[in-house]
Regions:
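Generic start-of-chain signal for non-secretory N-termini
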Residues: 1-20
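Generic hydrophobic alpha-helical segments
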Residues: 11, 63, 348, 553-556, ...
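NTP-dependent nucleotidyl-transfer catalytic core
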Residues: 16-42, 55-529
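Short, flexible active-site loop motifs that bind/organize anionic cofactors or intermediates
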Residues: 49, 361, 365, 393, ...
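Phosphate-backbone binding interfaces of nucleic-acid-interacting proteins
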Residues: 52
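Asp-based, Mg2+/Mn2+-dependent phosphohydrolase catalytic module
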Residues: 503, 521, 528-623
Length: 623
């Protein structure tokens, strides 16, 4: 029995009979009823109001009466709350659904065909000057999982990665290796290549800071104030000058610099491959920034010739986005060098040439929300058919409890170290609980790997991607509660029961009888299993509009007739108020009279324009 099909077809029939109108299937929006209301599924009736010419409540009541009378085998009862029609599903219908799910190993999936849309998903995006870290773990797991979900929903999927393999940060590691490496390699050091290069990036930073301190002290003795002395020292330090000289040589294709760059990057790529393999993720196509940044300049120059962009007196090239409620965006500096936006345009151009993309999804942290708003507009202007509708799959930060698994720098946790620690914790916990009884050492190692990495993946993926999260290794490895190990253990127990039943000749029925008892938890599980196919069939899913959604903010600005340059966001929460303002291009003021404390600001990758103790300090400050 297909509950969703019967409800959708019955709603279409109801609108036809009650209001004499034909409606497409996609207009029937069903979602799971909120827990504080009675019912299992909720029908949104607002799309039908133009047809009924009645209030939302009256429209919902009329459709509800029709469904209860004409779809009684599925609808047991209904109630109406402010225009939302909450439907209670008949127990026999749930039993039928469970039988359908049990009989179909691919229930809810849609097969991929030649005509399926092609979706490209970008995730990971590492730099080749250091290993993958905790933030990459969340990014990789979200990107890989999203790819599996999109493919199960009938899309052709290309998983792609853009490697940031050029720039001053890469030259810093190269210069440090030349100065202090003594020819060290991954083989001679016994280190993974990405960790080895990361060590030299740290070494550069250490010596660079020492040079800055010496120069700063010298400039202050000469009468310069502290801030000016610091800035001059950063620019005049011999190491940073050498690094910039190396970057110029790289851009001019100096053979020695290019050979060193290729050798050290290859070490890093080998290290990345090991990390990706352990994590269980991969890619269909990898792009490299060193191959894409020049393409971006070409596309910008083409746009300039077509009048899509403009050049300022200093020779820099800009895009005017003020008619979009945004600002002007730099695309090429006055010296002709590109910025990140330009590089993303170049990467998009190469991808579009390589694949007939229908939809592009970028899995990138929420600090880049504004960047992708702009990129979407620019790609649309340049003629990319998917540009306007590109998806930025935005996610929040992930952190560890203080004092746990800090790296050498004390700030970033390496992905390799985290996974090794998870496997170690899984081994220890399983030993303590007696899970390894009568197992060989090889079996114990494999189960520890499966349980440890399963704990990591589930703990990260169970949290709403849009939210910041705290990853606690000890909680994730618990064999009780909402954890990966508990789910794995429960599955193993169920399989064990089924094996014992088969050994004792107990036959498990293929189907439940129509009168089989079913409890509320089972109904809730069945309801959740039903939601994905409903959303797939209708093209609609529950959507909640609120902070930090930039659409709400831009709509408000348009209604007020105010440009983003003339408005300011004032709030007491970094994760909603301030990020909402930043994503919309507003100046932001954080007041400390509410939720966020001053000490907590440094945890976020973005900063407010101004921090005040309270709203009483506002007069004269917000300009």
């Amino acid at each position: 029995m297909k509950i969703e099909n019967e409800i959708i077809s019955s709603v279409i029939a109801a609108v036809k009979e009650l209001y004499g109108q034909d409606v497409p299937e996609k207009m029937v929006a069903l979602q799971k009823t909120k827990s504080n209301f009675e019912g299992n599924l909720t029908l949104v009736v607002f799309p039908f109001l133009k047809m009924s010419k009645k209030t939302p409540e009256r429209t919902a009541l009329e459709i509800g009466d029709y469904l209860k009378e004409n779809c009684a085998d599925v609808i047991a009862d209904f109630n109406v709350v402010k225009g939302f029609l909450n439907l209670s599903i008949a127990p026999a219908a749930w039993v039928g659904l469970l039988n359908t799910i049990n009989a179909d190993p691919k229930f809810g999936e849609k097969p991929v065909t030649e005509n399926s849309p092609l979706v490209m998903i970008e995730y990971s995006s590492p730099n080749t000057n250091k290993p993958l870290h905790l933030g990459h773990v969340r990014n990789n797991l979200l990107g890989w999982s999203l790819a599996q979900i999109m493919e199960a929903n009938g899309n052709k999927v290309i998983k792609t990665n853009i490697v940031n393999d050029r720039g001053i940060h890469i030259c810093k590691s190269m210069l440090a290796w030349l100065k202090w490496g003594n020819g060290e390699t991954p083989e001679t050091s016994g280190k993974k290549g990405d960790h080895l290069i990361g060590d030299y990036y740290v070494a550069f930073d250490k010596h660079y800071r020492e040079e800055i301190a010496e120069l700063k002290a010298q400039y202050e003795k000469e009468g310069m104030d502290e801030e000016a002395a610091t800035e001059k020292a950063k620019a005049e330090a011999p190491l940073i000058k050498e690094a910039h000289e190396m970057l110029v040589k790289w851009e001019n294709n100096d053979p020695e610099v290019r050979a060193l760059w290729q050798k050290m990057n290859n070490w890093v790529y080998a290290g990345f491959d090991e990390t990706y393999k352990m994590m269980g993720v991969g890619f269909d196509k990898i792009y490299y920034e060193s191959n894409t940044y020049l393409e971006g300049k070409k596309k910008v120059e083409e746009g300039l010739e077509k009048g899509l962009f403009f050049r300022k007196d200093d020779n820099s090239v800009w895009a005017d986005l003020t008619n979009e409620g945004l600002d002007q965006k730099l695309l090429l500096r006055s010296d002709g060098t590109s910025v990140y936006m330009t590089q993303d345009i170049g990467t998009a151009d190469l991808r579009f040439k390589d694949f007939p993309i229908d939809k592009m999804i970028y899995v990138v942290g929420n600090e880049q929300n504004y960047h992708f708003q702009v990129l979407s507009i620019l790609l649309d202007r340049l003629g990319f058919k998917w540009g306007k509708d590109l998806v930025h799959f935005s996610y929040g930060m992930v952190e560890l409890p203080n004092g746990k698994m800090k790296s050498r720098e004390g700030t970033v946790v390496d992905a390799d170290d985290l996974m090794a620690e998870m496997i170690k914790d899984a081994r220890q916990t399983s030993d303590e609980l007696g899970k390894f009884k009568d197992m060989s050492e090889e079996e114990r190692q494999e189960i520890s790997r499966i349980v440890g990495l399963g704990a990591l993946k589930y703990f990260i993926l169970k949290v709403d991607a849009r939210k910041n999260m705290l990853f606690n290794p000890e909680e994730s490895i618990d064999f009780n509660g909402n954890t990966g190990p508990f789910i794995q253990y429960t599955y193993a127990r169920i399989r064990s029961i089924m094996r014992k039943a088969a050994a004792e000749g107990i036959e498990i029925p293929a189907e439940l009888g129509a009168d089989a008892p079913i409890n509320e938890k089972e109904i809730d599980l069945a309801c959740k299993a039903l939601i994905a196919p409903i959303e797939l069939a209708t093209g609609h899913s529950a959507y909640f509009l609120g902070k930090p959604n930039p659409l709400m903010m831009r709509t408000g600005l348009r209604i007020l007739g105010v440009h983003s340059e003339d408005a300011v966001m004032i709030g007491d929460r970094m994760d909603t108020d301030i990020v909402a303002g930043i994503e919309t291009g507003l100046s932001t003021i954080l007041v400390l009279s509410g939720v966020t404390e001053r000490a907590a600001i440094k945890r976020f990758p973005y900063r407010p324009s101004l921090v005040l103790n309270g709203v009483g300090d506002l007069p004269g400050k917000a300009k």
